[in-house]
Amino acid sequence: MDSVALMPLLLLLLLQPPPATPAPPVRDPFALQLGDTQNCQLRCRDRYPKPQLAQEELGEDPIQSRRAKAYDRAVLTSACERGCRLFSICRFVARSSKPNATQAECEAACVEAYVKETEQQACSEGCWSQNPEPEPEPELEQKRKVLEAPSGALSLLDLFSTLCNDLVNSAQGFVSSTWTYYLQTDNGKVVVFQTQPVVESLGHEGARLQRVEVTWRGSHPEALEVHVDPVGPLDKVRKAKIRVKTSSKAKVESDELQDNDFLSCMSRRSGLPRWILACCLFLSVLVMLWLSCSTLVTAPGQHLKFQPLTLEQHKGYMVEPEWSLYPPPSHAYADSPPPYKLKLDLTKL
């Protein structure tokens, strides 16, 4: 009887599902392209811990106070985490810009995104938390090694490689491309990430911000769009027209009217002064004209070669010609009268 009573219990134990494994943490779909922001988000959560009610607040309305503080903490934490993501987006779009410029763009985006000063400060703290330690750039490190090397060890190969790197970096300013990423999240939804950057080189003098146009169209209604227009020197970044909106369409505005001529565009993209570009263009035109004229003058098919004749050769041609002359007519029959024809029928003998 005891064994019969234990059978249903054994069946229930066998049919019971295994204990559920803990769900894996949600993976950021943009971590591969934009960089990991988990550490920055953890710093934001540690910076704004859960609120603890004081003794004097317990007698008023502890539930209402706790809800208000929890809401404020959630808002500040969200602003800080958004600052982390904004910094990674600005750094992804403007790879060639300096960290200070990326930090300035992120802070300007925070100023435009939030109205309250506390939220702006939290977003800026997220930008600072995501900002990595400044590392020496490979080009600058290579130049420093070349300059610090002794004169005997300085070779032409190092100078040539440095010159090639400078030319390649200058040529990158002419490249303007668009990236589109289609990522699938863990819940099966497809997220489209589009970037339309306008590459602008940041020089030492008159450095200008790059225009960043990022559209984040996800499954959630809060889509992120960042628009940064070229607004002049970096010290005026606070006055930048930067839009962080949740709409599907954003307007791009510009405060300054930049020079649109060819030399200004080339100077802005290459980083060279206008007078150097003008001199190079003028010399190129002169070289092309000189090559065209020299080609026309020295072309081998445009000349006929004549062999000069000496005086003896000229006389030889006149005295002894190579061809036979036509014999002159004979004068034997010149004085004789023409023959006379007689009519024999009319003649009478």
Curated annotation (Swiss-Prot):
UniProt main location, coarse: Golgi
Keyword Signal: yes
TM region(s), chain numbering: 276-296
Residue interval(s) of motif Microbody targeting signal: 347-349
Membrane topology annotation: Single-pass type I membrane protein
InterPro entries: Uncharacterised_TMEM59 (IPR022065)
Function: Modulates the O-glycosylation and complex N-glycosylation steps occurring during the Golgi maturation of APP. Inhibits APP transport to the cell surface and further shedding.
Name of the molecule in the record: Transmembrane protein 59-like
